[in-house]
Structure formats: structure tokens, C-alpha cells
């Protein structure tokens, strides 16, 4: 039997493997030190501070309800504060994992007058909306930069290292639910007083 030439054409690869000279010309050399851009580090550090501020605000509300003799609401706000600390830890981990050198931002004192028992719930909804908007800006920045790793981390679902976008869906939902509950409670009490 006669040997036939292969009917399948041979794929020829004319491309040249990158040389170190080409690599040196094309890479972003700043990534040798840190994979995050300066703008991304600034945004994440700002969010790190915002999470600590949220923590302190919710601890302030916990103290208020403790002094009002409402330990269940105190406990609720302590748990909310703990969540904010967890978010802070996720951001800290990500910054450290990417070798981002930074200084902690200044955290302003919580100077808030609490005029009534509904206010902490209203303020919490507003603070969580603000937090969501801030995180969304970080996602947009990551997309604009083509920083797919940071985008994936922000949108991730990892209890240990982070899931900030998903977490904000939950945070806003819980905050709105508790505000509605508080408003129904106050309306019910007012109706009983007026009847």
C-alpha cells in the first residue's frame, strides 16, 4: 500500500514567542510593585475608611438603643457594626494581597443627634445607599481600567475574602425592611394613643 500525504494540512505557526526585550516594552512595569492602579488604591482606601465610619455609626445607634432599654435593637445594631468591620477586613485583605502600600484614612467622629427611635433606621438606609453608590463607582473604575481581577473580586461571592456588591444588595434590603418595621411599630403606637 502506498503512503499518501496527509490530507490534513499542517498548521504552521509563524508567530514568534515573546522575547524579554518585547516583554519589557509591553508590560505595565508598575505591576512589578503593585497590581492596582493609584486611582484604584485611593478608591479602596477611601472605602476602607467608609466601612469603619459605618461601623462607628452603627455602634453609636447600638449605644442609643441600649440607653433606651431596648437590648434587641442594641444587638441588631451591634451585628450591623460587625458586618461593616467584616467589609473593612475584606478590603484590607485585597489591598494587602495586591501589595498596595497605603496609610489608613482619617475617620471622622460620629456627631449625630438622634431625635427619635426611627432616625437610626432612616440613617442606616441612607448610609447603605451611599455605600452601594461608592462601591459601584469602584466597579466602574475597575471596568474602565480593564482591571478584571478587581472587578471579579468586587462582584465575588467569598465569605472570607469579599463579596462587596452582593453584600450591598443584602445590606440595603435589610435596612429597608427594618425601617418599614420601625415605621409600622410607630404608626401602631400612634394609632393606639389617638384612639
Give, region by region, the residue ranges found by the protein language model.
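Iron-associated oxidoreductase/ferritin-like identity signal
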Residues: 1-195
Amino acid at each position: 500500500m502506498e503512503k499518501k500525504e496527509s490530507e490534513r494540512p499542517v498548521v504552521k505557526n509563524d508567530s514568534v514567542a515573546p522575547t524579554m526585550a518585547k516583554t519589557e516594552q509591553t508590560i505595565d512595569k508598575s505591576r512589578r510593585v503593585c497590581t492596582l492602579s493609584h486611582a484604584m488604591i485611593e478608591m479602596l482606601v477611601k472605602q476602607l475608611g467608609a466601612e469603619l465610619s459605618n461601623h462607628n455609626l452603627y455602634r453609636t445607634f447600638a449605644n442609643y438603643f441600649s440607653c433606651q432599654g431596648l437590648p434587641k435593637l442594641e444587638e441588631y445594631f451591634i451585628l450591623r457594626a460587625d458586618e461593616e468591620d467584616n467589609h473593612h477586613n475584606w478590603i484590607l485583605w485585597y489591598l494587602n494581597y495586591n501589595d498596595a502600600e497605603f496609610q489608613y484614612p482619617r475617620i471622622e467622629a460620629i456627631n449625630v443627634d438622634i431625635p427619635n427611635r426611627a432616625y437610626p433606621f432612616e440613617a442606616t438606609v441612607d448610609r447603605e445607599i451611599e455605600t452601594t453608590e461608592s462601591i459601584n463607582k469602584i466597579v466602574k473604575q475597575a471596568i474602565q481600567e480593564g482591571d478584571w481581577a478587581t472587578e471579579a473580586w468586587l462582584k465575588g461571592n467569598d465569605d472570607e475574602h469579599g463579596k462587596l456588591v452582593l453584600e450591598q444588595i443584602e445590606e440595603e434590603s435589610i435596612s429597608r425592611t427594618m425601617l418599614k418595621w420601625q415605621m409600622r411599630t410607630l404608626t401602631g403606637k400612634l394609632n393606639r394613643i389617638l384612639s
